[in-house]
Amino acid sequence: MPDYSYRPTIGPTYVYHNKYYKNLGSVIKKPKRKKHLVEHEEEEKDPLDNYMVAEDPFLGPGKNQKLTLFKEIRNVKPDTMKLIVNWSGKEFLRETWTRFVEDSFPIVNDQEVMDVFLV
């Protein structure tokens, strides 16, 4: 059985860890992949992604459902937009969303700022 104990007489000891080594192919292909992603990012943008739909959560699929489209104005984080909504207890999704807002918009008591995650 090999002896891995430290002995200063045998000179410096090195420990190699796999996490510091990368596949040569991935190192070479990474810039190419990045360039490809940047070039095709514009093509993959769907105009439908610029709109949000307010759906009534109490109506299941297949029932008559009134859809309201909202134009996206500003993104807060990658998957999030801030909305001002009328607030009335648990039924806030039934209310009409008043408008998209900027940070400078004054928030009134009966309105609540929400982050809506688009999943």
From Swiss-Prot:
InterPro entries: Polyhedrin (IPR001746). Keywords: Viral occlusion body. GO terms for molecular function: structural molecule activity. The keyword Lyase does not apply. GO terms for cellular component: viral occlusion body. Belongs to the polyhedrin family. Major component of the virus occlusion bodies, which are large proteinaceous structures (polyhedra), that protect the virus from the outside environment for extended periods until they are ingested by insect larvae. This is Polyhedrin. The gene is PH.
